[in-house]
């Protein structure tokens, strides 16, 4: 399920094109307050997958019934959403009620959400495969310290939004600062571009 609220439909459209190219089944639900406020209507009508688009217009009384939409869930289904925070929260709540497991509920962001005033501390990364240790200063990200040590890690957004730099966590207490991992994912992984040891001078052993 692809759930787009307002301009948040933009990344959902990109995902729909990709899913169609892969021959995967999907449905795209687009919620807007009015047709005048809706973008992409002509593009969606002409898309080769236009029969999978469901438009919900509040001003016309066709506001999305999120619980009814989520009722179509089958094992293995995933739900992705992007839009105003209130909309995404409602979608995630409905998905949870419908039984979507946490790892099957995904939030997409246009920009970095608000976050606490974090305090950076130096810490150490221990690479499980070699036993090598890499020091991370308070002024740099783990990915920067690894790069300086000659260890390449793929990075895309550098904001903890995309998950490209996800790495397995072997041991250590992590201050997770990403916006992509579920609670279950955080038990076994971390996002290297953002997350740090939870305590000053802590040691994180990672699967590198």
Where would I find each of the regions flagged by the language model?
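Local cysteine-cluster metal-coordination motifs and their immediate loop/turn environment
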Residues: 11, 147, 151-175, 186-199
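Active-site donor-binding loop signature of nucleotide-sugar glycosyltransferases
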Residues: 58, 195, 208
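Iron-sulfur (Fe-S) cluster-binding modules
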Residues: 102, 198, 205-208
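Short, charged low-complexity linear segments at domain edges
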Residues: 124-149, 166-175
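A short, sequence-level motif marking secondary-structure junctions
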Residues: 137-143, 180-183, 196-198
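Short cysteine/histidine-rich metal-coordination sites, predominantly Zn2+-binding motifs
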Residues: 177-185, 208
């Amino acid at each position: 399920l692809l759930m787009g609220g307002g301009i948040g439909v933009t990344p959902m459209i990109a995902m729909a094109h990709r899913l169609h190219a892969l021959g995967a089944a999907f449905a795209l639900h687009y919620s807007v307050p009015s047709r005048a406020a809706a973008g992409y209507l002509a593009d969606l009508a002409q898309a080769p997958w236009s029969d999978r688009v469901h438009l919900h217009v509040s001003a016309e009384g066709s506001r999305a019934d999120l619980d009814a939409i989520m009722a179509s869930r089958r094992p293995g289904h995933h739900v992705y959403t992007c839009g105003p925070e209130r909309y995404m929260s409602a979608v995630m709540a409905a998905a949870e009620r419908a039984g979507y497991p946490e790892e099957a509920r995904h939030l997409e962001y246009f920009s970095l959400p608000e976050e606490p005033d974090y305090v950076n501390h130096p810490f150490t990364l221990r690479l499980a495969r070699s036993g090598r240790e890499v020091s991370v200063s308070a002024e740099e990200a783990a990915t920067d310290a690894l790069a300086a040590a000659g260890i390449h890690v793929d990075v895309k957004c550098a904001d903890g939004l995309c998950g490209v730099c996800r790495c397995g966590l072997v041991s250590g207490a992590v201050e997770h600062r990403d916006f992509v991992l579920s609670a279950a994912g955080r038990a076994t992984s971390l996002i290297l571009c953002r997350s740090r040891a939870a305590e000053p001078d802590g040691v994180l052993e990672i699967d590198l």
